[in-house]
């Protein structure tokens, strides 16, 4: 009996190590010149809660992080509700963040626009995806 109790912490540690890989929840998108690695918190996104998107941007060919870029994240629902935010530079190399607030559940057409420098003459590159938004959490949970 004591042997089984002693093995419980090892079993719990094994579950943590073998748990879901954070990379498996990462959305990966590519434009002509950039690779975007997108995570969101909380996951899955829920209506009526602010969702923070963290976006790592790399040069598609060299895999180097893009440090001086600018961009935005935005989404539109089927009933034309909109949400958007400009990117804020984070401490990590090539990492930006933006927050979206989804007013309704369902599928939203989401997109990122981004350019390497803050030069308005440079074109904005765009990637699109469908973001499924789940029902809001119950109050107090």
Label each residue range with its predicted role:
Residues 18-141:
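N-terminal soluble domains immediately following signal/targeting peptides that reside
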Residues 1-16:
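Sec-dependent bacterial lipoprotein signal peptides
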